[in-house]
């Protein structure tokens, strides 16, 4: 890693940690499903985008549950802090109905990211319900449709990324179903990059209570996907795993899994006290330095960065959040997320007095019906099929 890469990695960890701590202290008790303990997810996703672009990636479509979602929205999708904080401040919905009343950690977003090399990559985070892993086949369908629209026959231009919890990855059958379809004609998308935020707890259940295999990724042996087990407290290893995963996916067009071992700094949500159910584990976590502190100490010791420079990064991150909160407090209505852009430009929601025009010309339907009941002259039909056709 070059000195610039190390400093950039440190900066992203600062932003991720400061964001979570800001929400923790300013909005006490509000649910946010913190990423703390797994902040390396942000540079991991950064790396997938930056390393994928020179390998032909034009779009990345992401599906994930609630853990760390706000952090991803803020720092990968660049959803403005003001918009996120306005939802914490209680700003009303705009009343137009598509996401009215939904919680902040279900929301999606899209963003056109320009890489350091100047290449544009379109990023999409799909909306998600509380039902864990339900979004998996939805993402695959979105990517399949995009690839068809772009005539991306090799599947290199649009890449699906699914972020899982380790308990859900083994516990939800929809994961196994999605894996099983991954390389079938009519379903395959050229490989999915799976990221497991392995915080070693499923709400209050330990791994021993949710599976009997050593790793949550063992369920993926059915498709023989390569798995990279990596320690989130070693962010450089996380970045390296992401680089290899993207290169492997682009070259071999198969699923790849990154099993990022980390921990959950607080409870399942902000109303959960984990010391009641995992007292020994949380005694250790309370004494454990954050990924950012560990990496900061490492870079300072190597003389890659001065401590005052690190403090400046923290001050800058806090300052941006403070400014955003002042703006958010003045917003009476939460800013609406733009829904119809890109290839959806010109479309709008159907209303009571407006329905979509779904009609097809009679001549076109007749022509389709005729072709559907014809067989090539040199094709020998089964006699039962022949009676139906003729």
Place the predicted regions along the sequence by residue.
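Active-site-proximal helix-loop-helix substrate-binding element of RNase H-like nuclease domains
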Residues: 217
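Conserved internal helical-beta-strand scaffold that buttresses enzyme catalytic cores
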Residues: 1-175, 179-208, 212, 223-228, ...
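Short acidic loop-to-helix transition motifs that present clustered carboxylates
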Residues: 233-238
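Flexible glycine-/small-residue-enriched beta->alpha junction loops
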Residues: 283-287
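Glycine-rich beta-alpha junction loops
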Residues: 66-68, 262-265
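C-terminal catalytic or substrate-handling cores of phosphate/nucleotide-
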Residues: 229, 242-250, 255
């Amino acid at each position: 890693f070059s000195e610039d890469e190390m400093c950039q990695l440190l900066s992203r960890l600062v932003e991720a940690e400061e964001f979570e701590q800001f929400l923790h202290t300013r909005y006490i008790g509000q649910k946010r499903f913190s990423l703390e303990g797994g902040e390396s997810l942000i540079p991991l996703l950064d790396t997938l985008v930056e390393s994928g672009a020179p390998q032909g990636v034009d779009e990345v479509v992401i599906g994930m549950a609630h853990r760390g979602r706000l952090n991803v929205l803020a720092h990968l999708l660049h959803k403005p802090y003001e918009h996120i904080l306005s939802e914490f401040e209680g700003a009303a919905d705009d009343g137009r109905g598509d996401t009215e009343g939904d919680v902040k950690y279900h929301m999606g977003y899209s963003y056109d990211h320009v890489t350091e090399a100047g290449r544009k990559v379109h990023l999409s985070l799909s909306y998600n319900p509380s039902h864990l892993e339900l979004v998996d086949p939805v993402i695959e369908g979105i990517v399949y449709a995009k690839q068809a629209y772009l005539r991306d026959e090799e599947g290199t231009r649009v890449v699906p990324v699914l972020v899982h919890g380790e308990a859900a990855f083994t516990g939800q059958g929809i994961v196994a179903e999605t894996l099983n379809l991954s390389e079938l004609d009519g379903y395959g998308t050229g490989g999915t990059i799976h990221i497991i935020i392995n915080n070693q707890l499923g709400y209050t259940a330990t791994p021993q209570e949710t599976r009997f295999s050593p790793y949550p990724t063992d369920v993926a042996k059915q498709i023989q996907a390569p798995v990279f087990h990596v320690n989130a407290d070693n962010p450089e290893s996380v970045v390296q795993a992401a680089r290899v995963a993207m290169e492997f996916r682009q070259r071999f067009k198969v699923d790849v899994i990154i099993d990022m071992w980390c921990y959950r700094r607080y409870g399942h949500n902000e109303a959960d006290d984990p010391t009641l159910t995992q007292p020994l584990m949380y005694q250790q976590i309370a004494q454990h330095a954050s990924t950012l502190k560990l990496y900061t100490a490492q870079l300072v010791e190597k003389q890659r960065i001065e401590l005052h420079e690190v403090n400046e990064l923290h001050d800058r991150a806090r300052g941006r959040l403070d400014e955003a909160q002042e703006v958010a407090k003045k917003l009476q209505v939460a800013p609406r997320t733009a829904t119809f852009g890109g290839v959806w430009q010109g479309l709008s929601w159907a209303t009571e007095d407006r329905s979509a025009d779904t009609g097809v010309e009679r001549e076109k339907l007749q022509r389709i019906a005729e072709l559907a009941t014809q067989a090539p002259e040199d094709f020998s039909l089964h006699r039962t099929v022949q009676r139906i056709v003729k």
